From Swiss-Prot:
This is ESCRT-related protein CHMP1B. Residues 172-203 are annotated as: Disordered. Belongs to the SNF7 family. Keywords: Coiled coil, Cytoplasm, Endosome, Membrane, Protein transport, Transport. Residues 192-203 have a biased composition (Basic and acidic residues). GO terms for cellular component: endosome membrane; mitochondrion. The keyword Protein transport applies. The keyword Metal-binding does not apply. It is a peripheral membrane protein. Interacts with CHMP1A and LIP5. Interacts with VPS2.2.
Length: 203
């Protein structure tokens, strides 16, 4: 049981570390929101240089939050695998004892004992199948959270949308996500009206 106990202690330590990383992630999220609020207040005071600095801080906190979250996710995946390994080790030891009991039953010709042993044997096999399936699912779902390309630009655009910074502080807009202007919307409406008029004229 020494190795199993050691493994369980390691699993406990990893779980503790993962929770600590998640707390750090939540802390960074709160700090990010605080920086965004500073951006808003700086704009209200006309302090665009300060607003830019606070916006950069918000982006940095967002990046830190994702890094902590990514590490926590990877640790959780490792813990799931180790936890499965520990359970499989315990089951394997139980199987060894059952095999010995089955051999004893066969040697003595005790049918009742043999039947009881086979019940235990089959139950352990079911447990092993469940654990194996759990491990496969854990491995399939253990891909780390990756920050999508353009994550920073998207967050900067969010700050811009919330506080009207897209022009005043020159924040870049992610490709393909430019906000349509009122003029563009008006042109689209005029074009649609023109096409409808043409269709009516043809009718």
């Amino acid at each position: 049981m020494g190795n199993t106990d050691k493994l369980m202690n390691q699993i406990f330590d990893l779980k503790f570390t993962s929770k600590s990383l998640q707390r750090q992630s939540r802390k960074c999220e709160k700090e990010e929101k605080a920086e965004k609020l500073k951006v808003k207040k700086a704009i209200e005071k006309g302090n665009m240089d300060g607003a830019r600095i606070y916006a950069e801080n918000a982006i940095r906190k967002r990046s830190e939050q994702m890094n902590y979250l990514r590490l926590a996710s990877r640790l959780d995946a490792v813990v799931a695998r180790l936890d499965t390994q520990a359970k499989m080790t315990t089951i394997t030891k139980s199987m060894t004892n059952i095999v010995k009991s089955l051999e004893s039953s066969l040697a003595t010709g005790n049918l009742q004992k043999m039947s009881e042993t086979m019940d235990s044997f089959e139950k352990q096999f079911v447990n092993m199948e469940v654990q194996a399936e759990f491990m496969e699912n854990a491995m399939a779902g253990s891909t780390s959270l990756s920050t999508p390309e353009g994550e920073v630009n998207s967050l900067m655009q969010q700050v811009a949308d919330d506080y009207g910074l897209e022009v005043s502080v020159g924040l870049p807009q992610p490709a393909g996500h430019a906000i349509p202007t009122k003029t563009e919307e008006k042109v689209d409406e005029d074009d649609l009206s023109r096409r409808l008029a043409e269709l009516k004229a043809r009718g």
